Amino acid sequence: MKNKNQMKVEKILRLPSWIKFPISKASEFEKMQRLIRKSNIHTICEEGRCPNRAECYASGTATFLLGGSICSRACAFCQVNKGKPSEINKYESIQVAEAVKILNLKYVVLTSVARDDLPDHGANLFVSTINQIRKIDPKIQIEVLTPDLWGGGKSFEDKDKLQKDRLKKILEQRPICFNHNLETVERLQKEVRRGANYKNSIGLLEKAKSIAPNIQTKSGIMLGLGETLKEIETTILDLKKVDCNQITIGQYLRPSLKHLSVKKYWAPKEFEYLKSFCSKLGFKKVSCGPLVRSSYHAG
């Protein structure tokens, strides 16, 4: 057994000077938080402790989290609670739609925890919520950010078909954008995204474009988990090969000591290089910077 002197001491990197969190009016921040609690809804802004949530709240925007606040997976980077998911709130879609109405939103982002416990992996959560929002105003633009919808069935072919069927249900509602995040490069997938798979995620984005060519597709990756520049470029090229239209690239920030450590803080000039790299490849929208998250400045 190792003694304290022999135990490996983890190196924790200091937050660099270029990472500065936006400050917003406390009144606006508290107003949005009160609405979220009163409405009995969840947002990824709160559950994921997003560094931009004060700024987004000040502008009256939020990304709604469907399926409760407990995720059936345990990704090593994510702040969202993990464990046995709660029972589905049958009023959730109505409550989210009411919040959209109160906030007078014109562009809404819907995401969800992974619900591997449900036969449809949560696809109908998106369908019902989109329908409720459209009852309020059919002109509201809706972006969806889904899990990989992978699972069930005995063979790969079964799982592949189920994924496509679940995806088709969502895309039939005609969201303006379909988003699914790769999160990291292929080599680090197993360590970072437990229960997920790089090829399954690329396949989901490819299926989305095949099913609904006119719907914009989008994906995001985090930097600072031990990836190399070459691996990032390869990931970006993989997204371009499946005709992904939009991309977000941001710095991974460790939520707590229980989560994966930050291996590197990428400098602003490196983000600028990657933004240029993506733009030259023809991505229609590129958001790239230390505090960029997949739903930041969406729309």
Curated annotation (Swiss-Prot):
It is found in: Cytoplasm. Binds 2 [4Fe-4S] clusters per subunit. One cluster is coordinated with 3 cysteines and an exchangeable S-adenosyl-L-methionine. [4Fe-4S] cluster 1 binds at residues 45, 50, 56, 295. It comes from the Bacteria. [4Fe-4S] cluster 2 binds at residues 71, 75, 78. One of its GO terms (cellular component) is cytoplasm. The keyword Cytoplasm applies. It catalyses: [[Fe-S] cluster scaffold protein carrying a second [4Fe-4S](2+) cluster] + N(6)-octanoyl-L-lysyl-[protein] + 2 oxidized [2Fe-2S]-[ferredoxin] + 2 S-adenosyl-L-methionine + 4 H(+) = [[Fe-S] cluster scaffold protein] + N(6)-[(R)-dihydrolipoyl]-L-lysyl-[protein] + 4 Fe(3+) + 2 hydrogen sulfide + 2 5'-deoxyadenosine + 2 L-methionine + 2 reduced [2Fe-2S]-[ferredoxin]. Transmembrane segments: none annotated. Keywords: 4Fe-4S, Cytoplasm, Iron, Iron-sulfur, Metal-binding, S-adenosyl-L-methionine, Transferase. Its cofactor is [4Fe-4S] cluster. Its EC number is 2.8.1.8. GO terms for molecular function: 4 iron, 4 sulfur cluster binding; lipoate synthase activity; metal ion binding. Pathway: Protein modification; protein lipoylation via endogenous pathway; protein N(6)-(lipoyl)lysine from octanoyl-[acyl-carrier-protein]: step 2/2. Residues 57-284 form the Radical SAM core domain. Pfam families: LIAS_N, Radical_SAM. The keyword Transport does not apply. Belongs to the radical SAM superfamily. Lipoyl synthase family. HAMAP family: Lipoyl_synth. This is Lipoyl synthase 2. It comes from Prochlorococcus marinus subsp. pastoris (strain CCMP1986 / NIES-2087 / MED4). The gene is lipA2.
